[in-house]
Amino acid sequence: MAEGGGYRERPDAETQKSELGALMRTTLQRGAQWYLIDSRWFKQWKKYVGFDSWDMYNVGEHNLYPGPIDNSGLFSDPESQTLKEHLIDELDYVLVPAEAWNKLLNWYGCVEGQQPIVRKVVEHGLFVKHCKVEVYLLELKLCENSDPTNVLSCHFSKADTIATIEKEMRKLFNIPAERETRLWNKYMSNTYEQLSKLDNTVQDAGLYQGQVLVIEPQNEDGTWPRQTQQSKSSTAPSRNFTTSPKSSASPYSSVSASPIANGDSTNTSGMHSSGVSRGGSGFSASYNCQESPLTHVQPGLCGLGNLGNTCFMNSALQCLSNTAPLTDYFLKDEYEAEINRDNPLGMKGEIAEAYAELIKQMWSGRDAHVAPRMFKTQVGRFAPQFSGYQQQDSQELLAFLLDGLHEDLNRVKKKPYLELKDANGRPDAVVAKEAWENHRLRNDSVIVDTFHGLFKSTLVCPECAKVSVTFDPFCYLTLPLPLKKDRVMEIFLVPADPRCRPTQYRVVVPLMGAVSDLCEALSKLSGIAAENMVVTDVYNHRFHKIFQMDEGLNHIMPRDDIFVYEVCSTSPDGSECVTLPVYFRERKSRPSSTSTGAVLYGQPLLVSVPKHKLTLESLYQAVCERISRYIKQPLPDESGSSPLELGACNGSRSGCAGEDEEEMEHQEEGREQLSETEGSGDDEPGSDHGEATQKKNKGRPCPRRLFTFSLVNSYGTADINSLATDGKLLKLNSRSTLAIDWDSETRSCYYNEQESETYEKHVSMLQPQKKKKTAVALRDCIELFTTMETLGEHDPWYCPNCKKHQQATKKFDLWSLPKILVVHLKRFSYNRYWRDKLDTVVEFPVRGLNMSEFVCDPSARPYVYDLIAVSNHYGAMGVGHYTAYAKNKLNGKWYYFDDSNVSLACEDQIVTKAAYVLFYQRRDDEFHKTPSLSFPGSSDGGARPSSSQQGTGDDETYSMDTN
């Protein structure tokens, strides 16, 4: 076995590439096992074998050797090997089938102590089956009926059965196999549901992240401990159970759902975790299942329990719930006569029915908060992307739900085939009316009545000037935000002067700039020439990437740790220098063998050495000088019996080059040649003078060095070969990577951990950032949306005149607008390297949004809108939290919805940088009439004025339990 845990007998690069390439095309099969590999390691392996056709320049080079498989970057806790939250496929990890994993493991091994991260393939979807690897397992809270305070956490796959959970609970709570048990699903504060179908899967049962399950062993006399309580609660509804509004907080809030199910990476079965964590007092001492008397709640002011990262869904639902025309339609049961169960594009009416049931609960006035379990289960069945417990996008859920409701409620039973016609110079009004009528012939529902409008799209060929005008329906407006022209980066500068600590800077660089722009900006603040800077990405004590000056800054993600090193291209005498990456490693004995392993630590270095002086001795001196700031002098009883040769650390030259034999066996033959006090270095090992010198030194301890050198791969996990120690020049270049290996005792005595990690803050970090006027008006976004643009070279238009694809100019205009205008602010942007969120404040009116000036139909009616709801997103892309503001249709007051919590809000709180999706209601005198089938620009239909919406709402703040 090679150093670092890999096998020497591995196939050549071409064979590895061929075998893995075929396996990576394996299709997902339900129940199959797949493995997670850190994408950084996998990318290094791909470079090493030339996996990608565009990256085959350095195939097989030693410095690219990836070493043993290292998944440490995926763990939030290296000890328990728990996965980090919000890992993203291809960006953070890659998935490989079991056979591919086994091959890589045989060829390279795995970092010692790490267990494979294996997961199962599960199936989603009701009609169209969709397989995906279940990366995050579901965390369930388990307890016994007799001791509800003893709560244990355990992870399960959605493919596990209820019988599997029961078996695990029997084992955890020491319940004999012959004793009868019942399993209960407990949620909110006092609602139970028996899980009687043991062959149901976790997914079938609708269990969610943080769900509490109670196991109830039967009494010896054959009765059940909860029998009396069960009879009291037997009238509870079987779906979407609720609790009393008097319960202001959940008695088991301490075991509520964490942001994401991490699973247990040490579990190789992929079924459920063998490790169980114990919670504190998971339940209150009172374990009463009887529901409290119902109290009147203002209809519509109903919170939604978080089922584990479902705040995105709750936010979207609260906005739709407070869309009066749609909610009235469901509350009046008008949907029942229009359900289309035969629509092949629909969901057999099940989404419409699930939504109707939820809306009725939310507007019943009985429930302060409900858990939308069954609704989420139904959504997950038809849209697998929403079936898990990872953070999703509220706008994407809205898009799915509006489309799903439309198809479930489509009044058109058989859609006719219609041929699309081009305008061909006909008047816009004629073409628009034709397009809308054709749309209504195939799509006729309450969603079309309420949410659909019409775009005008104009394309002009740059070659023949052909003009193509089409009119297309839309359900919501996605508006771009003016892009930021620059970005702020926080980086560390490591000066060449070893006496100076690294300094953290905050610099402003062009958003789409190059690495050279970063160096120029840093040069202005530091005074160091930009040409003497090397920009690196440091990850896990190694250089993940060393950037070239012409590389784009979009390759650098906001979370990357960027270190800029000052280096010297020439020495003081003008000779050329070579700059070498150097890693710190500690040699540790492996408990299972007599060999040693190396563990990376500390901050890597870039060390410059004159090419004509690149010997082992000069390299040692250069490194010692570089680290002199954090080399400490040990106490007399700490340094051991042998003196230490500190080299340049204390200004002295080498006194002896003798190293510990176990550490530097490969440098044994060069010891005398590196010593100045023991001879000239020209003596032959067998000469009389050499032998006399050795005898002279034999009786006294020989100084040890701080560390030894190894030529390693760019990951620092595998040794390539030893360095020449005969005094000759070392054959190293800037692509070589060195490791300085310390034994544990020397590191403990001489290496000052605290000083090595200490850095200074530049004044740019201490000064508050200048806040530019970043707010933009909503009209600016609309104008940007309607601005003419040229299509990109990868997105051309096929010109029917030229008979070829052209980069035409394209312009969108608004022709007619719907009764409910949904505006999606496009805050999220991403490319192959990084993701970003625009936190720009968009100033949008709460009242009187006049869209008439943006509508190009000259005969259009006035379009004036009032805001009725906002979906908010706090945090970064892929993470964070969703909430909603919404205006209650009965009392006209604004409320803030944060999962289960509902509180009164003021209008001046609504416009924030978190606003993501806006809901506007058109001013119309008869808005709540049954939606007509007319063209959306017509004047029929209207809105009941909010002043006439009478209600007896309570103005107090509702503080409810958040799951």
Curated annotation (Swiss-Prot):
Residues 953-963 have a biased composition (Acidic residues). One of its GO terms (molecular function) is metal ion binding. The completion of the deubiquitinase reaction is mediated by the DUSP and ubiquitin-like 1 domains which promotes the release of ubiquitin from the catalytic site enabling subsequent reactions to occur. Residues 459-463 are annotated as: Necessary for interaction with RB1 and RBL2. GO terms for biological process: negative regulation of protein ubiquitination; positive regulation of TORC1 signaling; protein deubiquitination; protein localization to cell surface; proteolysis; regulation of protein stability; spliceosomal tri-snRNP complex assembly. The keyword Hydrolase applies. Keywords: Cytoplasm, Hydrolase, Metal-binding, Nucleus, Phosphoprotein, Protease, Repeat, Thiol protease, Ubl conjugation, Ubl conjugation pathway, Zinc. The modification Phosphoserine is found at S445, S675, S680. Residues 405-407 are annotated as: Necessary for interaction with RBL2. A motif (Nuclear localization signal) lies at residues 767-772. The active site is at C311, H881. Residues 27-216 are annotated as: Necessary for interaction with SART3. Residues 485-775 are annotated as: Interacts with DUSP and ubiquitin-like 1 domains and is required for USP4 activation. PROSITE patterns: DUSP, USP_1, USP_2, USP_3. It catalyses: Thiol-dependent hydrolysis of ester, thioester, amide, peptide and isopeptide bonds formed by the C-terminal Gly of ubiquitin (a 76-residue protein attached to proteins as an intracellular targeting signal). Residues 219-277, 634-701, 930-963 are annotated as: Disordered. Belongs to the peptidase C19 family. USP4 subfamily. This is Ubiquitin carboxyl-terminal hydrolase 4. It comes from Bos taurus. The gene is USP4.
